[in-house]
């Protein structure tokens, strides 16, 4: 509300910390945030399609035979779950092709996917509870095999936050279009609060409906929780319908990211902060074609290099790393711009921002600790959060390269 300019957090970072950190945030959007998010959610779609047909997979020996070691990060297994990865790349190609050919067509497709999303959520929440085939005791019954205690319980709770934070991420996307919103001083805070509340309520209701149908142990061991819950309520056909609707719903999120995310890269290229090639508009289709292709190539590389868990974890970690900086930036702006008009003031300042700052920092430290300890103990072959940090840090030499280049051309 204080800075109603198109660009959202990119603009905030520049005002708070300067050009370097704004550039690094823009780079992170390309290297991790938007691309890992797009690759990760499309991975889910490919996995749910396995409800209908089994995708080919190499033997464990072959999957382990090709391993790329990244110093200080871990090992990448490109052949692991290869069938799902190839289908994921194909789905990303289709979404990119549609966006490349026509922005309008991409918007029409988005409407179809949105309808599927509403149907999927409605059937899951209403249908599962209405079936009467679940058990409310699932909400209070302990599982004999899942009993973390002490510090392990704390780690488990932090790990469980990843899914919730990913589901809620995006509720603030309206800030990217703040410069196009009428009366942003009132409209933005209202839409942000309402959007976050709606997302929280839907997330809790969907989760509750699945807990009602499946005991905790069954949920923990399921690869397709929503379909398994629907299958228990409505049979194989019901599970298939939910799987299909989830695929369409997830493709809607993919389509939105493929449509919008490359435009940040396109804008950075126009500002000569990215290769000029990425800032060229397609002469016929009038779309940021080169930026779209660049994003598709990088998303495909991320898909081959990881799994849904790897992509989701590193994406959420980097998002909340920058969120930490933005929360702290509230205090910076109070000092740098004390007389600026503030249509909306943070409730409970400074205690509420401090509480958010503490939770954010605690979450990041615990995730980093979990990733490193799991890697050292051999539970995982890669440190997801460190992987995201390394990819983000690659933007540092690029910043100085483009800055030096701009200085020479000036």
Model-derived features: positions:
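Hydrophobic transmembrane alpha-helices that form the core helical bundles
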Residues: 1-92, 97-100, 247-267, 307-321
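TM-loop-TM module centered on a large, flexible mid-protein loop between adjacent transmembrane helices
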Residues: 11-12, 18, 50-67, 141-149, ...
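Alpha-helical transmembrane segments of multipass membrane proteins
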Residues: 27-30, 96-97, 125, 207-209, ...
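Transmembrane helix-loop boundary segments of multi-pass membrane transporters
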Residues: 40-48, 53-61, 67-81, 104-113, ...
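Hydrophobic alpha-helical segments and their helix-loop junctions in multi-pass secondary transporters
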Residues: 47-57, 115-144, 167, 208-214, ...
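Membrane-interface loop-to-helix entry segments
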Residues: 83-134, 192, 315-325, 350-355, ...
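Junctions where cytoplasmic loops transition into the N-terminal start of transmembrane alpha-helices
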Residues: 112-116, 175-211, 264
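C-terminal membrane-solvent junction of multi-pass transporters and transport-like membrane proteins
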Residues: 277-287, 323-386
